[in-house]
Amino acid sequence: DLHSFPTRRSSDLLGRNGAGKTTTMKMLLGLTKPTSGEVKIWGKALQGNEKKLLPRIGSLIESPGFYPNLTGTENLRIFATLRGVPNNHAIKDALDLVGLPYKDKKLFSQYSLGMKQRLAIALAVMHDPELLILDEPINGLDPIGIAEVRSFIRELCDARGKTILISSHILSEISLLADDIGIIDHGALLEEESLAELEQKSSKHIRFTLSDTAQAARILERNFHENHFSIQDDHNLRLHNLDLPVGKIVTAFVENGLEVSEVHTCEESLEDYFKRVTGGEGIA
């Protein structure tokens, strides 16, 4: 159940290994058939429209098969011919984006892991797709390689207006790579929200456990002109404005007939939030 991610933004499918991230991406590319339901892209069913839809998508799923005895440019020329990419300018532009030289005698077999990953992303963007699907694009890279990949992913999204769907299990990279987050576990999308919303949910806050959160929300809005709160369920409310007088809020709740059983100041990390949503262990 993959909802509609925003266009011209970078969205991250976040989940532990085996959560269903790669399988979901393969279904979006027609590489795996769903056991039930259907895949729709841009409002159209993928099945029966592959020739129209798939050329508008670039992807990196696992490692592409490059020829080890050819240079990066020579490898891209072969794929360009197969895909009908018209000229060498598209190849040069893709290589420039990922920081690889167009005129280079180094063979693919001599590439470092980071260079191989960059060439794979160059292949994914060479035909100027509208949508990019990148499965674990920073997996196995050193800090410098991660920073480089992060930089041109942001450029594709921010400067070139691409819609990007990334899968990841590295929490520390989320805020640097993604605008929107989807938490996936056992093949189901559990949460889908912007990074700003996610950070607010996992930031420092005051948690009230009480008899009626809907009434508590009305009291906060009416008595304190406050709307920086989130209702978790019928009995738990989070207040994100820490400058408000907690004692006066509790008094107002009680005077209006609410039963307040607990008040806590909480600070939840992104990993804690992930654990709570998935109901399991950490993401690693």
Segment roles from a protein language model:
Residues S4, R8-I166, L171-D185, L189-E191:
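ABC transporter nucleotide-binding domains
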Residues T81-G84, G279-I283:
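Non-catalytic alpha-helical coupling and interface elements of nucleotide-dependent molecular machines
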Residues W42, P55, S175, E199, ...:
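Alpha-helix boundary recognition
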Residues S151-H240:
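ABC transporter nucleotide-binding domain
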Residues K204-V277, A284:
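Short, charged/small-residue-rich alpha-helical element at the C-terminal edge
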Residues L46, E50, N88, L195, ...:
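Residues at or immediately preceding the N-termini of alpha-helices
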Residues L54, L76-R77, K92-L95, A147, ...:
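Generic structural signal for individual residues within well-ordered alpha-helical segments
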